Curated annotation (Swiss-Prot):
<dbReference type="InterPro" id="IPR003837">
    <property type="entry name" value="GatC"/>
</dbReference>
<comment type="function">
    <text>Allows the formation of correctly charged Asn-tRNA(Asn) or Gln-tRNA(Gln) through the transamidation of misacylated Asp-tRNA(Asn) or Glu-tRNA(Gln) in organisms which lack either or both of asparaginyl-tRNA or glutaminyl-tRNA synthetases. The reaction takes place in the presence of glutamine and ATP through an activated phospho-Asp-tRNA(Asn) or phospho-Glu-tRNA(Gln).</text>
</comment>
<keyword id="KW-0547">Nucleotide-binding</keyword>
<comment type="similarity">
    <text>Belongs to the GatC family.</text>
</comment>
<comment type="subunit">
    <text>Heterotrimer of A, B and C subunits.</text>
</comment>
<keyword id="KW-0436">Ligase</keyword>
<dbReference type="InterPro" id="IPR010120">
    <property type="entry name" value="Glu-ADT_subunit_C_archaea"/>
</dbReference>
<dbReference type="Pfam" id="PF02686">
    <property type="entry name" value="GatC"/>
</dbReference>
<dbReference type="InterPro" id="IPR036113">
    <property type="entry name" value="Asp/Glu-ADT_sf_sub_c"/>
</dbReference>
<protein>
    <recommendedName>
        <fullName>Probable glutamyl-tRNA(Gln) amidotransferase subunit C</fullName>
        <ecNumber>6.3.5.-</ecNumber>
    </recommendedName>
</protein>
<dbReference type="GO" id="GO:0006412">
    <property type="term" value="P:translation"/>
</dbReference>
<dbReference type="GO" id="GO:0005524">
    <property type="term" value="F:ATP binding"/>
</dbReference>
<dbReference type="GO" id="GO:0050567">
    <property type="term" value="F:glutaminyl-tRNA synthase (glutamine-hydrolyzing) activity"/>
</dbReference>
<dbReference type="GO" id="GO:0006450">
    <property type="term" value="P:regulation of translational fidelity"/>
</dbReference>
<keyword id="KW-0648">Protein biosynthesis</keyword>
<keyword id="KW-0067">ATP-binding</keyword>
<dbReference type="GO" id="GO:0050566">
    <property type="term" value="F:asparaginyl-tRNA synthase (glutamine-hydrolyzing) activity"/>
</dbReference>
Amino acid sequence: MDEKTIEKIKKEAEEIINKFSEVLEKFNLEMEESYYIIDTRNVLREDEAVESNPEFREKFLKIAPKVNKEGYVVVEKGSWLK
C-alpha cells in the first residue's frame, strides 16, 4: 500500500474510534449487574418434580421406533449436524 492509502486508513480508523467513544459515553454504566434482562422470570409456573406415570412410559416405549437396553428412546442425529 502506498503512504496516502495508509494515512487515509489511519484517519478513518481514528474517526471510527472517536465516534464509538462518543456513543459509549452516553451509556449509563452505573447500574447494578444482573443476570436477567427483565425482572420477571418463569411467570407461568413454579418448577417442581413431577411423578412419572409408569403405564404411559410403557405404552410410549412400545411405540417408539428404537429403544436402547436402558429403556431410553434412541433418536436420529439431525442431518444438519454432519
